[in-house]
Amino acid sequence: GCGGGDKKDDKKPAAQKFINIATGGTSGTYFPLGGALADILNKNIPGTNASAQSTGASVANVNLLSQGKVEIAFIQNDIAYYAANGTEMFKGKQVAGLQGLATLYPETVQIVTLKKSGIKSVADFKGKRIAVGAAGSGTEANARQIMEAYGIKYDDIKVQYLSFGEAASALKDGNVDAAFVTAGHPTAAIQDIATQNDVVLVPVDADKADALIKKYPFYTKLVIKAGTYPKQDADVTAVAVKCMLAVTDKMDENTAYAIAKALYGNLDRMKSAHSAANAISK
């Protein structure tokens, strides 16, 4: 927080506690949820001035946290793992002091293709144009790790480093064969493609998921239920990472406790901001 008032302003109330919340892009799930969280904190913790800001999502948010530019950040637990261990995009740049405040909901690694591609399994990716996410992003690490579980390396495919917005357009235009997107489902961008095209979600088979989890403990298995997307008539097995709220060890315990208490006492406000919050449990 910030220091107290100066001498001549004794009549003013105690200094406000500014809480900056790092979210993600304005079209994602973090941004509306961050706005809802700011609202909850402002209404439930006296003297708090909380605000959400749009950012470049998980990787950027870890850096904002470690630089002290924000107090709370929405991040994926896999990115937190890389930061704490100094691996992947944090190789040689280990971040000390990251702490989890709350685990929110699963972010499903969704592998999207169109029916006409003929792709039914990740094993079919050889020689195909695959959008793996922006270079150095969490999605890209997910894509690489899942393909690795199937014995497929970047050399075996035509790698396209595209954000999911770009990948969605490329899929529709026939410029990529499949794309990875890591986001709470249902994901608006996939729903959008599915209204005009026959979308197929490529599963991650149970044995491959088990191998993945053994190597990368931040993954969990889940099912994308039939009917999640237009014309999706069967359940699809998938893996997910988790969205979490992270702080640093600079935040005092009382503040952290007050934030968690306010959040869990007002989950309805989070749920009204985005349906992904329906999966948050106390």
Give the location of each predicted region.
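Extracytoplasmic/secreted envelope proteins and their assembly/folding machinery
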Residues: 31-38, 59-62, 98, 122, ...
